[in-house]
From Swiss-Prot:
The record marks C22 as: Involved in tetramerization or stability of the tetramer. Coiled coil: none annotated. Homotetramer. The chain crosses the membrane at residues 9-29, 35-55, 83-103, 131-151, 160-180, 194-214. Keywords: Cell inner membrane, Cell membrane, Membrane, Repeat, Transmembrane, Transmembrane helix, Transport. The keyword Nucleotide-binding does not apply. One of its GO terms (molecular function) is water channel activity. InterPro entries: Aquaporin-like (IPR023271), Aquaporin_transptr (IPR034294), Aquaporin_Z (IPR023743), MIP (IPR000425), MIP_CS (IPR022357). This is Aquaporin Z. It comes from Pseudomonas putida (strain ATCC 47054 / DSM 6125 / CFBP 8728 / NCIMB 11950 / KT2440).
C-alpha cells in the first residue's frame, strides 16, 4: 500500500476519532438526554474499535502521533514514515474539530470558550488537577496504551481481537483520566480543538504533546523489552 493511501486512511481515521469522541463530549454529554462521562469514554473507544476494522489493514490504524512514535520506539514502525503519519493525523483532527464547531455553533447559547472538549490542567482541568498531576496521568496512560496496542497486535497474541482490546483500553483510559485532563493521550486529538478555541487551550497544548510522547516512548520500549525472545 502506498504511503499516500496510508496517510489518507490515517486522516480519515483520526477525523472519525475526534468527531466521535470530542463530538460526543461537546454535543451529547450534557444535553437532557446526555450520555455523560461513561458515554464519552465509550465513544472514544468505539471510534478506535470501528476504525481498526475499517482501516487497520491499510495503515495500521494509529490515529495518534504518540502511537506512531511509540511504535517506532518499539520497532514496529519505520521512523522515516513518522512525520507523514503525524501530518495526516493532525489534519484529520483539525477537520473534525471544524465540523464539531460548525454543528455546535448552530445552537443558541454556544460558547467556544467552553473549550470544544479541549484538554487542560489547573483551572482548565475538569476536576481541578494540577499540571503535575496532568503530566503523570498523560505519561502513564499513554504508556499503558502502547503496551496494550503492541501486545494485542503481537503475532503471538490471539488473532482478530486486537481492535476490541485496544478500543476497550482507550475507554478505560478515559474513565480514569477525563476528570484529570479531559484525557488526551493523543497530541492530534488535543491540537484540533485547541486551534479553534485558542487562548488557554493553545497555551496548555504543549503538555498534550510532551507527556503523551514521553509515555509512548516508555510504553514502546517497555513492551519491546518484555516481548523479546531470550
Amino acid at each position: 500500500m502506498s504511503l499516500g493511501k496510508r496517510m489518507g486512511a490515517e486522516l480519515i481515521g483520526t477525523f472519525w476519532l475526534v468527531l466521535g469522541g470530542c463530538g460526543s463530549a461537546v454535543l451529547a454529554a450534557s444535553s437532557p438526554l446526555g450520555i455523560g462521562v461513561l458515554g464519552v469514554a465509550f465513544a472514544f473507544g468505539l471510534t478506535v474499535l470501528t476504525m481498526a476494522f475499517a482501516i487497520g489493514h491499510i495503515s495500521g490504524c494509529h490515529l495518534n502521533p504518540a502511537v506512531s512514535f511509540g511504535l517506532v520506539v518499539g520497532g514496529r514502525f519505520p521512523a522515516k514514515e513518522l512525520l507523514p503519519y503525524v501530518i495526516a493525523q493532525v489534519i484529520g483532527a483539525i477537520l473534525a474539530a471544524g465540523v464539531i464547531y460548525l454543528i455546535a455553533s448552530g445552537k443558541a447559547g454556544f460558547e467556544l470558550s467552553a473549550g470544544l472538549a479541549s484538554n487542560g490542567y489547573a483551572d482548565h482541568s475538569p476536576g481541578g488537577y494540577t499540571l503535575g498531576a496532568g503530566f503523570v496521568s498523560e505519561v502513564v496512560m499513554t504508556a499503558m496504551f502502547l503496551v496494550v496496542i503492541m501486545g494485542a497486535t503481537d503475532a503471538r497474541a490471539p488473532a482478530g481481537f486486537a481492535p476490541i482490546a485496544i478500543g476497550l483500553a482507550l475507554t478505560l483510559i478515559h474513565l480514569i483520566s477525563i476528570p484529570v485532563t479531559n484525557t488526551s493521550v493523543n497530541p492530534a486529538r488535543s491540537t484540533g480543538p485547541a486551534l479553534f478555541v485558542g487562548g488557554w487551550a493553545l497555551q496548555q497544548l504543549w503538555l498534550f504533546w510532551v507527556a503523551p510522547l514521553i509515555g509512548a516512548a516508555i510504553g514502546g520500549a517497555l513492551y519491546r523489552g518484555l516481548a523479546k525472545e531470550p
